């Protein structure tokens, strides 16, 4: 009788997984993993049409100048309900240096982490083109209609604990989310 119960339970679990084969496709998870030193970039995507970017630009010299231009565009046709989850759990991603994490689950999430550092010994001017580097465009490129489904994002208190340096994290679950972290540092002698 115990074998029959165990067998029926196993078939029930398999049947529930087969009932929604897409459910696991929209789940991104980082658990108790990853230590780093120096520059570390991580893009994790679950689902469809995710756009993620981690950019690091460093310039050193008498007239050092840094810049980066990133554009993401996406047209979504989301008509099916989507359940999505993104989680960072346990003592994940602890270290020192520059860390960029993009974690997206669902459909059509756009994420950017940008870090720019310039070291120079000459004066520099700050004009509109430099200021525009840190602007996230507000043009909506996601789904025009709401898409039903449950979404969840979680980050454990132990994640990133003890990290030093620059930590940039974008974490989203759902449809058409846009997030951006940008940091520009200029050091002049």
From Swiss-Prot:
Region forming the signal peptide: 1-19
Keyword entries, A-Z: Amyloid, Cell adhesion, Fimbrium, Repeat, Secreted, Signal
Subunit architecture: A minor component of purified amyloid fibrils. Fibrils are resistant to boiling in 2% (weight/vol) SDS and require >90% (vol/vol) formic acid to dissolve.
Full protein name: Functional amyloid subunit FapB
Gene: fapB
Family stated for the protein in its record: Belongs to the FapB/FapC family.
Source organism (scientific name): Pseudomonas aeruginosa (strain ATCC 15692 / DSM 22644 / CIP 104116 / JCM 14847 / LMG 12228 / 1C / PRS 101 / PAO1)
Example GO biological process: cell adhesion
Main location: other
Cellular component per GO, a single term: extracellular region
Keyword Cytoplasm set for record: no
């Amino acid at each position: 009788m115990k074998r029959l119960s165990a067998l029926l339970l196993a078939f029930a679990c398999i049947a529930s997984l087969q009932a929604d084969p897409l459910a696991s496709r929209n789940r991104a998870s980082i658990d108790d993993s990853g230590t780093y030193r120096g520059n570390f970039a991580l893009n994790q995507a679950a689902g469809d049409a995710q756009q993620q970017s981690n950019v690091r630009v460093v310039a050193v010299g008498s007239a050092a100048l840094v810049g980066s231009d990133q554009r993401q565009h996406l047209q979504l046709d989301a008509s099916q309900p989507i359940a999505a989850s993104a989680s960072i759990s346990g003592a994940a991603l602890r270290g020192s240096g520059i860390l960029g994490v993009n974690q997206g689950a669902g459909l059509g999430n756009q994420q950017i982490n940008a870090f720019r550092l310039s070291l120079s010994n000459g004066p520099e001017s700050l004009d509109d083109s430099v200021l525009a580097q840190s602007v996230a465009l507000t043009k909506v490129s996601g789904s025009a209609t709401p898409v039903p489904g449950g979404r969840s994002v979680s980050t454990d208190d132990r994640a990133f604990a003890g990290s030093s340096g620059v930590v940039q994290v974008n974490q989203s679950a759902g449809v058409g989310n846009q997030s951006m972290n940008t940091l520009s540092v200029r050091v002049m002698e």
